[in-house]
């Protein structure tokens, strides 16, 4: 069995190495995809603690130099970094891994644009990124491969708890005003709410604490949220691992401190999806809650031959969804 974990570690994770390592190690992954892996020293430290090799999509130049990284217990065969700054907002990392049984598995790690403040314009940008990603991955058709990372998008049919997101954004704005340096990189109201709706700011506290208004906000959020980028991947034949194994579980991954939506995914090629044994979200590990480590929760997918007893629960790990 090969266990894969995808995790946005929030602006490099410099002050949270212990927490991140505890969360990751609790899942006992063979391959780890890290998003916002901006600091090579942090990636190296986590890799050393986990006994893994690592590859990065680029070098460190500044705190917001968004990078992806891959950690692996398994042999790394080759690595490619795809840079298309005219389309892709962050480098696209491709790593070929040799699984324990000798099979080759190509892993792609992405971090799509957020641009939530642009509303449907943001989803249009993500769709252009997905088009570029599909072109890159076309060479792997017919071979096992997967795409994972932070897609900053809600899947068709998924819930969005806009009221939970609003309460989180209000809280983070307040914390940022008190201590800007400590909360750099966390989402805030301006990064999510379109400018044309900024006139609502004086009323947000009232909305966030009114049950009727929250219910209306959740309904509106689910109806008007753009879902085109995830729909494109599904139409291209890629399998949403978590949703395949958990048809009814929301599987929220973000924000970890006030779960509102599922924006982190592991997509498998059809041939690889035939080996999918389980997929789940890690909410706690080794006594560390998810929101202590990052503003995202990690997602796991397990691939094997589905032999009875192989895919049982891992000790020290708390998840959402059944470990099927």
Where does each model-flagged region fall?
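N-terminal, active-site-proximal structural segment of metallo-dependent hydrolase catalytic domains
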Residues: 1-49, 56, 60-68, 261, ...
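Active-site beta-strand/loop signature of hydrolases that rely on acidic residues for catalysis
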Residues: 3-9, 20-43, 95, 107-108, ...
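Short, flexible loop segments at the rims of nucleotide/cofactor-binding pockets, characterized by
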Residues: 8-13, 34, 83-84, 121-126, ...
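Soluble or luminal CAZymes and related metallo-dependent hydrolases
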Residues: 12-19, 87-89, 124-132, 221-225, ...
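Structured beta-strand-rich core segments of catalytic domains in phosphoester-bond hydrolases
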Residues: 16, 31, 35-115, 122, ...
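A shared catalytic/ligand-binding motif for oxyanion handling
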Residues: 31, 36, 93-113, 118-119, ...
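Metal-dependent phosphoester-hydrolase catalytic domains
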Residues: 81-83, 139-140, 153-324
């Amino acid at each position: 069995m090969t266990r894969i974990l995808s995790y946005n570690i929030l602006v490099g994770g410099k002050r949270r190495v212990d927490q991140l390592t505890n969360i990751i190690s609790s899942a006992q992954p063979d391959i780890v995809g890290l998003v916002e892996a901006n600091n090579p020293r942090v990636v190296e430290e986590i890799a050393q603690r986990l006994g893994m090799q690592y590859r990065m999509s680029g070098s460190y130049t500044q705190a917001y130099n968004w990078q992806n990284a891959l950690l692996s217990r398994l042999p790394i065969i080759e690595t490619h970094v795809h840079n298309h700054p005219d389309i892709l907002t962050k480098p696209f990392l491709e790593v070929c891994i040799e699984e324990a049984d000798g099979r080759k598995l190509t892993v792609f790690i992405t971090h799509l644009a957020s641009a939530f403040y642009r509303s449907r314009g943001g989803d249009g940008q993500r769709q252009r990124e997905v088009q570029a990603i599909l072109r890159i991955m076309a060479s792997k058709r017919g071979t096992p491969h997967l795409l994972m990372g932070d897609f900053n998008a809600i899947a068709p049919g998924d819930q969005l708890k806009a009221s939970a997101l609003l309460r989180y954004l209000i809280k983070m704005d307040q914390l940022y005003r008190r201590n800007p340096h400590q909360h750099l990189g966390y989402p805030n109201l301006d990064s999510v709410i379109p400018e044309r709706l900024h006139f609502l700011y004086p009323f947000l506290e009232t909305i966030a604490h009114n049950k009727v208004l929250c219910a209306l906000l959740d309904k509106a959020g689910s109806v008007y949220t753009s879902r085109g980028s995830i729909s494109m991947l599904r139409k291209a034949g890629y399998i949403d691992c978590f949703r395949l194994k958990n048809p009814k579980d929301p599987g929220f991954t973000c924000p970890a401190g006030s779960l509102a939506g599922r924006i982190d995914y592991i997509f498998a090629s059809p041939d690889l999806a035939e080996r999918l044994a389980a997929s789940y979200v890690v909410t706690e590990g080794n006594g560390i809650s998810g929101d202590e480590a990052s503003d995202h929760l990690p997602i796991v997918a397990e691939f094997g031959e589905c032999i009875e007893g192989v895919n049982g629960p891992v000790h020290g790990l708390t998840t959402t969804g059944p470990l099927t």
